[in-house]
């Protein structure tokens, strides 16, 4: 029997390949219009942490579950119905009684326009008092998830941690349980200034994220995430952090893993948005002192950029869960992210065959 590369829990002993913890919102997409001028919206489900579980299930065929909470009303049931299409198991969704008007509990709404040309993508979230933001330690049976059912991987991120004062405690509780049972943990820093603004600001974001990262095996984040969420500096970037030198990123990673030696792998996408419709796109990942880079895709045509990073994350994790080397995994993540941005919504509509074709350099000729 050949030696495994990543020392993950055996698939046969686990019900889940991955369990994700995070908010699932209802995304309202105005199509080619602006949010403020639209007269109709198309709906999708989405959330930074959930999108990873959905990609692994829908595109890559793995068994995944989501831990979240929803207000039990028609909007929550619409989100549930959308999640059914993605195939992510909902047995650990916590349903909260609705008060009839949303004074005490609600479901999150995310109005997002895709952008085009010189008009950037833009979002307007309505997510105060959501059911998931009120999750508290002790409400989820993590022992059941990681011991009785078993999960090879656990994923959460900085968006969930920023929702309230209690959500970091829930994330920490989940990580402790996952680690006790040998489950790998990934964390996407995903710094959102708007979420932290009323929750302690950048100082609190740094404190919370630094505590959580001490439990993490795979850390995902771009240069802004590492500076704002962890307090590290990336050299040789402009004030808007729009250009990233690979050598500077490598030096920053080395400082991160020196302070957090538990981190085995660090990954990020590299995006230079020439316009909303054309981005230079690639990805890199670090492990054991070496940096692995994907194929560069200059001027990649973008239909909807939202969720590209989450799809990179799910492709990367798929590579590791299937015991590929890190070069293959980062190529898989970059290809999946590129494909996810060719269709509307936060989540991928790609298949594994699509991803493998793009990884091999396949073009856009008609497949017959």
Residue positions per predicted region:
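Short catalytic helix/loop segments, enriched in acidic residues and glycine
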Residues: 34-54
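Alpha-helix C-terminal capping segments
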Residues: 44, 52-63, 85, 319-322
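Conserved N-terminal subdomain of the carbohydrate kinase-like
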Residues: 63-158, 355-368
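Hydrophobic beta-strand scaffold residues
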Residues: 64, 90, 185-187, 220
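Catalytic-core regions built around general acid/base machinery
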Residues: 169-182, 207-215
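Conserved phosphate/ATP/ADP-binding segment of small-molecule kinases
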Residues: 192-289
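Conserved post-catalytic alpha-helical subdomain immediately downstream of the catalytic base
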Residues: 276, 292-362, 366-368
């Amino acid at each position: 029997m050949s030696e495994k590369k990543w020392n993950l829990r055996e698939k046969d002993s686990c019900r889940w390949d991955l369990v994700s913890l995070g908010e699932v919102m209802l995304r309202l997409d105005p199509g080619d219009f602006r949010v403020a001028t639209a007269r109709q919206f198309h709906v999708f489900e989405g959330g930074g942490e959930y999108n990873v579980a959905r990609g692994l299930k829908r595109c890559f065929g793995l068994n995944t579950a989501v831990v979240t909470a929803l207000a039990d009303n028609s909007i929550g049931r619409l989100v549930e119905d959308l999640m059914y299409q993605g195939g992510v198991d909902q047995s650990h969704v916590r349903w909260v009684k609705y008060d009839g008007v949303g004074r005490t509990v609600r479901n999150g709404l995310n109005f997002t326009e895709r952008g085009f040309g010189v008009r950037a993508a833009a979002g307007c979230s309505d997510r105060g008092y959501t059911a998931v933001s009120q999750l508290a330690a002790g409400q989820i049976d993590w022992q059941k998830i990681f011991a009785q059912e078993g999960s090879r991987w656990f994923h959460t991120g900085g968006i969930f941690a920023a929702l309230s004062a209690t959500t970091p405690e829930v994330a920490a509780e989940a990580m402790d349980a996952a680690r006790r049972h040998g489950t790998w943990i990934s964390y996407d820093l995903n710094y959102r200034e708007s979420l932290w603004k009323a929750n302690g600001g950048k100082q609190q974001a740094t404190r919370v994220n630094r505590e959580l990262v001490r439990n993490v095996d795979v850390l995902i984040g771009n240069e802004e995430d590492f500076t704002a969420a962890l307090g590290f500096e990336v050299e040789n970037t402009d004030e808007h952090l729009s250009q990233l030198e690979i050598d500077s990123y490598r030096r920053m990673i080395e400082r991160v893993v020196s302070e957090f030696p538990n981190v085995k792998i660090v990954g990020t996408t590299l995006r230079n948005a020439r316009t909303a419709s054309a981005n230079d796109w690639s990805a890199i990942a670090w492990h054991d002192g070496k940096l692995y880079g994907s194929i560069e895709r200059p001027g990649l045509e973008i239909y909807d950029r939202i969720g590209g990073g989450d799809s990179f994350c799910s492709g990367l994790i798929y590579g590791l869960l299937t015991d590929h080397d890190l070069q293959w995994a980062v190529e898989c993540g970059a290809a999946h992210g590129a494909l996810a941005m060719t269709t509307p919504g936060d989540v991928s509509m790609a298949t594994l065959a699509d991803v493998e074709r793009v990884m091999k350099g396949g073009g856009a000729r008609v497949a017959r």
